[in-house]
Amino acid sequence: GGDIHEHKLKLIDYNAQNLGLKNVRTLLQNACTIGQKYGGRADRVLIDAPCSGLGVLRHKIDLRWRKQLSDLRTLPALQRRILESASQCVKPGGVLVYSTCTLNDDENSGIVNEFLQKHPEFHVENAAEKLAVPGHEGPFIQLLPQRDGMDGFFIARMKKES
């Protein structure tokens, strides 16, 4: 896993060790440039994109006071850059998963649909079928706190043509 924050990498390492996972490596890495370094080498890429966090407000109450309206305007540009760069890492036949913990369509389906229009080599797979999430229709998974009894998340699964 890669992140620009060292404290997050330490948390990933700690959790991987506690779970007995031996195949997890962490890198201090900017996701906006990762495609240049690892282009076309990955079977699977998971993007946990930085987002407004609107899906986790009930657990992270301080977000209500820390987030600014300007965040909602600037985050999609960062998310686009990350998705663009990370997509370059996926080799033909590989899978790219884009996820956030927000309910904002501009950060979710808006980003993915725009990406898919620019990248015909990727097609969306039905994430709800692949992940066996009952009660969810369509290609994307959008978990809603009021409906699903958990934090809000968005998941899109895309496959790169061989």
Model-derived regions: residue spans:
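S-adenosylmethionine
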Residues: G1-S162
